């Protein structure tokens, strides 16, 4: 969900995704690039995300882009997440 959420804001390259998750979570999630790429590959295989190569300065960088199917799945996941949080809050009485 976190990766799709970030890509819903803008196309990003792998290291940028890692840095953004670490930054926004204030260090609560310390995602490593080695953990990220298998997830990205599964998202690509599922048609949720696509990738493209772009030259930035003298470097070739791979950017990831959320597709329509990914946006739809993100919406579903967010609804599921909200339902879970609502249920937990009812149980905890908050």
Task: Describe the role of every protein-language-model region.
Residues 1-35:
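N-terminal helix-turn-helix DNA-binding core of bacterial DNA-binding proteins
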